[in-house]
Design a protein with these regions (language model features):
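An N-terminal assembly and electron-transfer interface module characteristic of large anaerobic redox
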Residues: 1-257
Length: 257
C-alpha cells in the first residue's frame, strides 16, 4: 500500500564531532571520519551528513548548527571524539529543532596524537549526560554509548527509527470528536505526555462531525475512492456494500479544516 499522505518522515542525520580544546582537534576529526566511513560501508551513506565544523566553543556550535540546518538534517548525532566541551556540545541539542543522540569514542590507537594512546570519551559522556539533565534537554543515549567506529555506526543506524518516531510525533495533530463543543478541551484523557512529545490535540463536536459527513452526501469523489478501497482489500472485501459509506467518512475526515 502506498503512503499517500506522506506521513512517514525520512530521516537525514547530521554527524557533528566535538573536541575539548586541551585535546588535538585532529583526533576528533579522524575518529569522526572513521565513523562516517564505517557507516558508509555498512549502511546508506546518503542518510548521513558529516558536518565540517568541529565544535570546541559556542561560536563553533552556532556555525555547526547552521551547517546541519542548511543540509536539511532533521536529526542529530553529537559525537564526542574526545572528552568534549560540555557547554557548546549540549547547547547544540538545545537549539537544534529535532531529536539528538550522543555517542562517544572508545580508546583506540591515537598514534602520536596523545601520550599512552589515551583518548576515550567515556568520562566526557558522563559529564555531557549530567549537563543535558541540568539543562532539561532531552537527548537519546544508547545503553552503552561508547564504542569503536563500527560500533558507533551501528548505534547511529539504530537511532534512525527512534528519530523517525520523534519527528513524526512532533508533527502530529490529533483531531478528536466528543460530546463537547468545538475545540473545548475539557477531556480527562492523560494528554500531558502527548504534549510533551510535541503532539497537538484539537477536540471537535460529534454533532459537527455528523453534519460534515452529510455535507459529503453524493460527493463525486466517492466512486473512485470505493474502487481504490476495493483494490486494496482484494479477496478480503467481504462487505462491499459498506465501502461507499466508509469512503464518504474518509473524505469527511480528510477535508476537515
Amino acid at each position: 500500500m502506498s503512503n499517500k499522505l506522506g506521513n512517514i518522515p525520512q530521516i537525514k542525520l547530521g554527524l557533528v564531532a566535538v573536541s575539548r580544546n586541551c585535546f588535538p582537534m585532529s583526533l576528533s576529526e579522524k575518529r569522526r571520519d572513521a565513523v562516517a566511513a564505517a557507516y558508509a560501508e555498512k549502511y546508506d551513506r546518503e542518510e548521513l551528513f558529516v558536518c565540517p565544523t568541529i565544535i570546541e566553543n559556542e561560536l563553533d556550535m552556532r556555525k555547526a548548527l547552521g551547517e546541519v540546518n542548511a543540509a536539511g538534517c532533521n536529526a542529530l548525532v553529537v559525537y564526542l571524539g574526545n572528552f568534549g566541551p560540555e557547554t557548546p556540545e549540549t547547547l547544540l541539542a538545545k537549539y537544534f529543532d529535532g531529536p539528538a543522540m550522543y555517542v562517544a569514542a572508545a580508546e583506540d590507537d591515537c598514534g602520536d596524537a596523545l601520550i599512552d594512546d589515551r583518548g576515550d570519551a567515556y568520562c566526557g559522556m558522563l559529564n555531557a549526560s549530567y549537563n543535558l539533565k541540568l539543562r532539561g534537554v532531552k537527548a537519546y543515549r544508547p545503553e552503552y554509548p561508547v564504542g569503536t567506529a563500527p560500533e558507533v555506526a551501528d548505534m547511529i543506524k539504530e537511532f534512525i527509527p527512534i528519530a523517525r518516531a520523534v519527528v513524526g510525533l512532533g508533527n502530529l495533530k490529533l483531531i478528536t470528536f466528543g460530546p463537547r463543543p468545538q475545540d473545548f478541551l475539557a477531556c480527562n484523557a492523560p494528554i500531558a505526555r502527548l504534549y510533551d512529545l510535541g503532539v497537538e490535540i484539537e477536540e471537535n463536536s460529534e454533532l459537527d462531525l455528523y453534519a460534515a459527513y452529510h455535507d459529503h452526501d453524493g460527493d463525486e469523489r466517492i466512486p473512485a475512492l470505493v474502487e481504490e478501497m476495493a483494490a486494496e482489500l482484494g479477496a478480503g472485501n467481504k462487505m462491499a456494500g459498506i465501502l461507499p459509506r466508509l469512503a464518504q467518512y474518509e473524505l469527511t475526515l480528510t477535508d476537515w479544516a
